[in-house]
A protein has these predicted regions:
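C-terminal helical cap/extension that packs against the catalytic core
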Residues: 65-71, 77, 112-171
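Active-site-proximal loop/hinge segments that shape catalytic or ion-binding/gating pockets
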Residues: 177
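Short, active-site-adjacent cap segments at secondary-structure transitions
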Residues: 180-182
């Protein structure tokens, strides 16, 4: 048994992920990993596109200093439910706006329904540099059919600017696809 600091990751589910990684490395016995190595590594873990809080970078210039930008490549219903649990832990006085881009072969309606009573609005985008994405207009209609206010936007930059103009204190959550998360991170 080892007492560890919390991982440098957002979301309670990450504790389970880290525990699994540690247990796996111990069971493989190929690596001579010491407890102090694990303790040090846990505080330095970075998981790009998984509940990533964007604190610096080019995208920050499109929002107010009070807006929080989160990115997660969640693309299925199970991941959506895990992310919703994390969003439930955030400041309930801040409205959450979702920027959403998804691939065509996903369960769009079920994914979106997970966030029905959590997000204020969904802004849909096409996923750049991908062929098999669901068109933003169709995705927006699905969100509206789930009872969530939704509109389309032409770019992540405009989506961020418009959300920040509407609510300079909002949490902006970008999700729906690992490809989408990657494109957003590339812009940053």
């Amino acid at each position: 048994q080892i007492n560890l600091p919390l991982p440098n990751l957002l979301g309670d589910f990450q504790i389970s992920n880290v525990s699994t990684a540690i247990a796996t490395s111990r069971n493989l016995n190929q690596f001579k990993i010491k407890n102090n190595h694990i303790k040090k590594a846990i505080t330095k873990i970075r998981s790009e596109g998984r509940l990533q809080n964007i604190k610096i970078g080019k995208l920050r210039k499109y929002v107010s200093k009070n807006n929080q930008i989160l990115i997660d490549g969640a693309h299925n219903v199970l991941a959506a439910s895990v992310i919703k649990k994390y969003l439930d832990t955030l400041n309930q006085r801040k409205k959450i706006y979702m920027i959403l881009g998804m691939m065509a072969n996903k369960e769009h309606k079920k994914f979106i329904e997970t966030f029905k009573n959590k997000v204020h609005s969904i802004i849909t985008l096409n996923i750049p540099n991908q062929e098999n994405f669901i068109k933003k207009e169709k995705l927006s209609k699905i969100a509206i059919s789930c009872g969530i206010h939704s509109k389309t936007e032409s770019s992540i930059k405009l989506a961020l600017k418009n959300i920040s103009k509407e609510n300079s204190n909002a949490i902006i959550f970008c999700t729906g696809s690992l490809y989408f998360a990657g494109e957003i991170l590339n812009l940053n």
